[in-house]
């Protein structure tokens, strides 16, 4: 959303009038006819159009440094990206300050989200054999997805290579409503993608009375 300065043009034209020249003659000689008046001067050329002012450079967006969006993108950067490139899941999660826990009988690593509620957290799951995909489970304040999505938008923009937005929609369902935002860089030979899926009841209310839930997936693939 850029604005360009518009320059105004003011044309000024002037006409110069010349006095008729007269010559004096000998008294005995007939007077010479008066010289015709000088032709009117040509109007001055209008000034050249001013060049438009240079557009101000748009500042690069920056990732937030606090809030849930900052926590989530920090896990993406420090855990997910190096993990799909072959990094060790346990070592990366531990180095990012995540704590070992169990969920549904499986070992996971968790990191608190903001709000001071123990149920608000990011959960990193063991990738198992599918090491090209990093899967995060998010439990956050009810209706608290907006700052997370804003942060993911910036993260995808700053990602190298840039990942443009691909989806922002939902699929109606009788059991769980899935609202999807996705970003992807792809060529004929590779894909780097980010998918954020909110999980809600069909009427849009939370699945859990205490928090909202979402799944966040990051992947890198070659073909």
PLM features per residue range, with description:
Residues 116-120, 140-150, 190-195, 205, ...:
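Short, surface-exposed beta-strand/loop "edge" segments at domain boundaries and coil↔beta transitions
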Residues 84, 137-139, 200:
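Extracellular/secretory pathway and lumenal proteins
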Residues 98, 109, 121-123, 136-138, ...:
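Hydrophobic beta-strand residues in large extracellular and virion-surface proteins
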Residues 117-184:
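Long, charged/polar, surface-exposed segments that mediate recognition or autoinhibition
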Residues 47-53, 65-128, 185, 223:
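N-terminal secretory signal peptides
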Residues 21-66, 200-207:
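Compositionally biased, proline/threonine/alanine/serine-rich low-complexity intrinsically disordered stretches
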Residues 179-223:
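Glycine-rich, aromatic-bearing surface loops/beta-hairpins
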Residues 1-22:
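Sec-dependent N-terminal signal peptides
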């Amino acid at each position: 959303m850029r604005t360009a300065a518009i320059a105004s043009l003011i044309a000024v034209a002037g006409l110069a009038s010349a006095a008729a020249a007269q010559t004096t003659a000998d008294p005995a000689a007939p007077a010479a006819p008066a010289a015709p008046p000088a032709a009117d001067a040509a109007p001055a050329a209008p000034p050249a159009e001013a060049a438009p002012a240079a557009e101000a450079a748009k500042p690069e967006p920056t990732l937030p440094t606090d809030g849930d969006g900052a926590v989530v993108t920090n896990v993406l950067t420090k855990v997910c990206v190096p993990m799909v490139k072959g990094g060790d899941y346990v070592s990366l999660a531990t180095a990012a300050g995540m704590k070992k826990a169990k969920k549904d009988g499986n070992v996971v690593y968790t990191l608190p989200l903001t709000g001071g509620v123990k149920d608000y957290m990011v959960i990193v799951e063991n990738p198992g054999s599918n090491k090209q995909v990093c899967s995060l489970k998010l439990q956050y304040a009810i209706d608290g997805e907006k700052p997370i999505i804003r942060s993911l938008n910036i993260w995808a923009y700053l990602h190298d290579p840039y990942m443009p937005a691909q989806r922002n929609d939902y699929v109606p369902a009788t059991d769980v409503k899935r609202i999807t935002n996705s970003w992807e860089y792809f060529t004929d030979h590779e894909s780097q993608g980010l998918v954020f899926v909110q999980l809600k009841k069909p009427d849009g209310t939370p699945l859990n009375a205490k928090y909202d839930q979402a799944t966040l997936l990051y992947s890198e693939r070659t073909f």
